């Protein structure tokens, strides 16, 4: 506990960031009445899945998810007539990265809205859905008739495979041109460039193999802090991991520490060391000045609600007492892939 541990915690997180980013967790919601006494499952590999606990189709969805190499697959079971609300309530306080629901047919918007609401509440959940949500937290998978062996999958059914693929990628790799070796054929887009520009995650066939066209999410409309690079899954995944790391280190090592200016600067310094380590590993762009800082402007606005700060300099604002609140900001540039 305490400040001496902050640098150690951040350094540890930076050193393991790439490995941890390739160990993402997929959450599945499956309709299945085979074994109704258990509603939640957690598997670290396919061999742990008991076939008799699931229908043939659902066992296949779990297997397809593991093809991408996620660290873990969480499965929430619901009955044939149940809504998704109970499963989402169980998932709300669990740790995971990507959600997929193979049976999804009419509730795409509801699920997308739930994900967007969770992200607004500082969760880093994302979902692969057959739905154009115009949001960086939703991957709009838009390829149909995916033939694997004797089975042809719908778009919704194969979202689990895409979720597993994305969860298994490290921050140093993008999804673009990742091969799905098991796929024999698809219904190919006649306008792939337009689809990608429209926020669709599609598969393409180059004549030899089926692969991801480009690793984009469903974000299309740019405004404010929604910039062009936020259309890319790799960028959002990296931002999410960095956000989670900083939040976790703050909660583990800084809560209940005296909120003096000196301690604020120690915490900011620890974040900056973390950023430097990520730059050296190629996660953050090494040509950018990636840094955290006291957000003087936000701090001034907060103080102005309590007393007149019009005559105070930025330096005076920076060292002013802010109670239990830290006003911190950061400017970083994620390293993109070619």
Per-range role (PLM):
Residues 1-61, 173-176, 195, 200-338:
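Structured, hydrophobic secondary-structure cores that serve as assembly/anchoring elements
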Residues 1-136:
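Small-residue-rich
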């Amino acid at each position: 506990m305490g400040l001496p541990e902050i640098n150690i915690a951040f350094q540890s997180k930076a050193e393991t960031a790439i490995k941890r980013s390739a160990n993402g967790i997929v959450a599945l919601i499956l309709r299945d009445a085979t074994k109704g006494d258990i509603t939640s499952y957690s598997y670290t590999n396919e061999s742990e899945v008991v076939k008799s606990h699931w229908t043939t189709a659902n066992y296949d969805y779990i297997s397809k998810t593991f093809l991408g190499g996620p660290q873990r697959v969480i499965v929430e079971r619901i009955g044939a007539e149940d809504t998704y609300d109970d499963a989402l309530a169980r998932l709300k306080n669990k740790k995971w990265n990507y959600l997929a629901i193979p049976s999804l047919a009419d509730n795409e918007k509801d699920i997308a809205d739930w994900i967007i609401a969770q992200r607004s509440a500082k969760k880093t959940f994302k979902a692969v859905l057959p739905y154009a949500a115009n949001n960086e937290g939703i991957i709009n998978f838009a390829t149909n008739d995916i033939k694997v062996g004797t089975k042809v999958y719908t778009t919704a059914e194969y979202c689990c495979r895409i979720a597993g693929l994305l969860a298994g990628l490290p921050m140093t790799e993008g999804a673009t041109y990742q091969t799905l070796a098991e796929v024999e054929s698809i219904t190919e887009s006649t306008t792939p460039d337009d689809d990608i520009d429209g926020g669709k995650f599609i598969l393409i066939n180059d004549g030899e193999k089926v692969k991801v066209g480009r690793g984009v999410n469903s974000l299309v409309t740019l405004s404010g802090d929604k910039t062009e690079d936020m259309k890319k899954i790799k960028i959002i995944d990296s931002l999410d991991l960095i956000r989670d790391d900083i939040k976790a280190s703050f909660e583990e090592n800084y809560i209940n520490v005296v909120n003096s200016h000196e301690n604020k600067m120690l915490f900011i310094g620890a974040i900056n060391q973390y950023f430097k380590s990520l730059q050296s590993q190629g996660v953050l762009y090494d040509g950018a000045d990636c840094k955290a800082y006291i957000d003087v402007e936000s701090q001034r606005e907060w103080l102005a609600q309590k007393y007149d700060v019009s005559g105070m300099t930025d330096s005076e604002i920076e060292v002013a007492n802010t109670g239990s609140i830290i006003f911190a900001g950061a400017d970083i540039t994620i390293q993109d892939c070619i």
